[in-house]
Amino acid sequence: MTNIRKTHPLTKIINNSFIDLPAPSNISAWWNFGSLLGICLIIQILTGLFLAMHYTSDTATAFSSVTHICRDVNYGWIIRYMHANGASMFFICLFLHVGRGLYYGSYMFSETWNIGIILLFAVMATAFMGYVLPWGQMSFWGATVITNLLSAIPYIGTNLVEWIWGGFSVDKATLTRFFAFHFILPFIISALAAVHLLFLHETGSNNPSGIPSDSDKIPFHPYYTIKDILGALFLILTLMLLVLFSPDLLGDPDNYIPANPLNTPPHIKPEWYFLFAYAILRSIPNKLGGVLALVFSILVLAIIPLLHTSKQRSMMFRPLSQCLFWLLVADLLTLTWIGGQPVEHPFITIGQLASILYFMILLVLMPIISIIENNMLKW
């Protein structure tokens, strides 16, 4: 008799995705982040669900409802801080996952890569709207500044912004709709993640060497299930260290001040994971130009596969490209630092140089270096 695991329509899908899935024998810990992102998403949905049971999306009570969750709800404080810091863990895993894709040439799976970019945009939108919900100073002014960027769109901009706001400023209508979208988007993200996996399993995983591994596959279970569990333990350990020892380390103190439309904070800045994009936005003195640069800073990932000029898929055996990749990482860290600094000399100049370098590396230097490396193979 055949095992029900392999015959039942539901278990068959799980079996082919997580148990009997043929996986390359040499994938490293950099391949753990897909499963870690899945765990992050589950943590965020569960903690978010329990927070939504006690949260009120009304400007008069939103701030005090969050306070109520932390003070009066059983273990409300831990749920709230797991949700807030879970977002940070989510983005750490996301950036490492995308970085892995860039380094090892995983972007050659174009469907998987493109859905990944859509997922990145969806997660960023969700995180932005979630940051507005506690209705602190940074929530209110962050929402005002970022939504206002849409007014740079010619002709329809102003109408579009007022339509999103549901009025002439960020107010009760904005908060209510942001809560609705923040609640529904993670489920859309879950569906997209399933499609992301579907496309990945059409081709099978890439591996560090970038060489096809069809001749050397091992079953996902037990080899990679145990490896993923180890990664998950590290993730949960890091998250709980953050939550239990310094829950406000990555937050902004201004968000403990209730939203006040009459008082602008001295430095409006988003959460740390958006600072690199915020720095790129601010580095261009023109409003529309800044908005385009902001969108393109993520959208540039979509044209990476078209700019792949190397004869090798992975960077494993390409030392010059490796140097350029780590320069890109350093540049992104610089942008993240600049995004959190005030708009004054020398930060403006550093931000502009770092922004130019970011696009230069991805669009110009990477393809050129790859061609040089191709020629070096003939030496």
UniProtKB/Swiss-Prot annotation:
Q: Which biological process, per GO, is one annotated for this protein? A: mitochondrial electron transport, ubiquinol to cytochrome c
Cofactor(s), names only, from the UniProt record = heme b
Return the protein name: Cytochrome b
> Which species is this record about?
Mustela erminea
Q: Which family does it belong to?
A: Belongs to the cytochrome b family.
Q: How does it assemble?
A: The cytochrome bc1 complex contains 11 subunits: 3 respiratory subunits (MT-CYB, CYC1 and UQCRFS1), 2 core proteins (UQCRC1 and UQCRC2) and 6 low-molecular weight proteins (UQCRH/QCR6, UQCRB/QCR7, UQCRQ/QCR8, UQCR10/QCR9, UQCR11/QCR10 and a cleavage product of UQCRFS1). This cytochrome bc1 complex then forms a dimer.
Q: Where does a ubiquinone bind?
A: H201
Topological type in the membrane: Multi-pass membrane protein
Further remarks about this protein from its record: Heme 1 (or BL or b562) is low-potential and absorbs at about 562 nm, and heme 2 (or BH or b566) is high-potential and absorbs at about 566 nm.
- On whether Metal-binding is a keyword of this UniProt record, the answer is yes
Per UniProt, subcellular location reads as:
Mitochondrion inner membrane
UniProt keywords (A-Z) are: Electron transport, Heme, Iron, Membrane, Metal-binding, Mitochondrion, Mitochondrion inner membrane, Respiratory chain, Transmembrane, Transmembrane helix, Transport, Ubiquinone
Q: What is its main location?
A: mitochondrion
Q: Which SUPFAM superfamilies match?
A: a domain/subunit of cytochrome bc1 complex (Ubiquinol-cytochrome c reductase), Transmembrane di-heme cytochromes
